[in-house]
């Protein structure tokens, strides 16, 4: 379980996050949404251990987070892939740093690429891939170390609508298959409502938890209902419009 208690963070002396309290149970998919400047990415970087926090605590499985660790896999919007390495070697890179024997890490990379639908692309280079394929590589790399927690920072924001829909459904299928804790940062309201088992709305200036919404649309998808059916459901549309109104309220209040 991920547990965040009374978390405060600032940047250059300016408060960015204030009194954040969140929990993420095993097998849940938590989505964090809010207007620009609410500290979404800062929160992910704190959980990843990339930057320090000033007060409070972040714990994963009862252990305080004080820096990066293999128990947390991270996927970024810009992928962060190495262009001079082929797809397989990109996925295996973290395993290489961890000292995993070559044949074992290449087999793990092969299995992860199979999971994300890139079997047969092992020897291709990053420049030969589409945006969606590059994000699949990024997800495969993050999963290769078998982390407890998968962190994704607006991973589909730069993709076209069709590819974004494909990646959303892929991530939900992987979430179901692996049973991992997943925390997704997004600015896309429809994506947030569709993918979350719990949706956290942050307010800006500094970021605070405005509202927490338990949702079941992701579970309906992994149970077999199509994404198109879910997104056209009046319940889904009503929730999407409610969340949109809350985000607009916050943006107007702090503009």
UniProtKB/Swiss-Prot annotation:
Keywords: ATP-binding, Cell inner membrane, Cell membrane, Membrane, Nucleotide-binding, Translocase, Transport. Its main location: membrane. Residues 2-229 form the ABC transporter domain. It is found in: Cell inner membrane. SUPFAM superfamilies: P-loop containing nucleoside triphosphate hydrolases (SSF52540). Part of the ABC transporter complex TauABC involved in taurine import. Responsible for energy coupling to the transport system. The complex is composed of two ATP-binding proteins (TauB), two transmembrane proteins (TauC) and a solute-binding protein (TauA). This is Taurine import ATP-binding protein TauB. It comes from Escherichia coli O157:H7.
């Amino acid at each position: 379980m991920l547990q965040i208690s009374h978390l405060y963070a600032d940047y250059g002396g300016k408060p960015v996050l204030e009194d954040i309290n969140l929990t993420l149970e095993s097998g849940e998919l938590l989505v964090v949404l809010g207007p620009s400047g609410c500290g979404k990415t800062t929160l992910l970087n704190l959980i990843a251990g990339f930057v320090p926090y000033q007060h409070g605590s972040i714990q994963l499985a009862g252990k305080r987070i004080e820096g990066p660790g293999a128990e947390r896999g991270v996927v970024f919007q810009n992928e962060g892939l190495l262009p001079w390495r082929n797809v397989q070697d990109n996925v295996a890179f973290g395993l290489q740093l961890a000292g995993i024997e070559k044949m074992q890490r290449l087999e793990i990379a092969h299995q992860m690429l199979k999971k994300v639908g890139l079997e047969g692309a092992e020897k291709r280079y990053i420049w030969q891939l589409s945006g969606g394929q590059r994000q699949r590589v990024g997800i495969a790399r993050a999963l290769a170390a078998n982390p407890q927690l998968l962190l994704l920072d607006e991973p589909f924001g730069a993709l076209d609508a069709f590819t974004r829909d494909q990646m959303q459904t892929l991530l939900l299928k992987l979430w179901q298959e692996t049973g991992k804790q997943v925390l997704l940062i997004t600015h896309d309201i429809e994506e947030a409502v569709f993918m979350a088992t719990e949706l956290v709305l942050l307010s800006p200036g500094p970021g605070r938890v405005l509202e927490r919404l338990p949702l079941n649309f992701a579970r309906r998808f992994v149970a077999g209902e199509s994404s198109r059916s879910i997104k056209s459901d009046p319940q889904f549309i009503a929730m999407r419009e409610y969340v949109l109104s809350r985000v607009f309220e916050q943006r107007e209040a702090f503009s």
